[in-house]
């Protein structure tokens, strides 16, 4: 049995490969329409599922546009190098940055996610 959070994407395998590289977590399972990052026993898996008619969310949220349903927050030690790595892997930096110790990025499928500096 596994527990997970499912994220919709136009190409689940590609998005799983992005997060696999970003997090250093291998892909545990992949089949047409679904990819799952391997999770240590007892941890929550991240599941990527193909969605017909997928529409990427807009950040920041805007009236009449697809709103983000959820987002990931990842704690990092060195914010600048973590952002540079995410950009090299295919993320983009969001224009709207609401906090100094957090960077909002957009993954290759258009989902916002945050890299949060670990201030101890």
Please identify what each model-predicted range represents:
Residues 1-17, 69-76, 116-120:
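N-terminal beta-strand motif that seeds the catalytic metal site of vicinal oxygen chelate
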Residues 11-26, 86-88:
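Amphipathic alpha-helical segments
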Residues 1, 25-71, 83-108, 118-120:
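Vicinal oxygen chelate
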């Amino acid at each position: 049995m596994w527990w997970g959070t499912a994220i919709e994407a136009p190409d689940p395998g590609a998005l799983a490969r992005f997060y696999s590289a970003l997090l250093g977590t291998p892909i545990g399972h992949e089949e047409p329409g679904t990819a799952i990052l391997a999770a240590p026993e007892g941890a929550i898996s991240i599941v990527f599922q193909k969605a017909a008619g997928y529409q990427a969310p807009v950040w920041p949220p805007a009236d009449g546009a697809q709103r983000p349903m959820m987002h990931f927050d990842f704690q990092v030690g060195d914010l600048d190098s973590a952002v540079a790595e995410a950009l090299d892997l295919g993320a983009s930096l969001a224009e709207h940055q609401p906090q100094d110790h957090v960077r909002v990025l957009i993954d290759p499928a258009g989902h916002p996610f945050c890299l949060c500096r670990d201030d101890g």
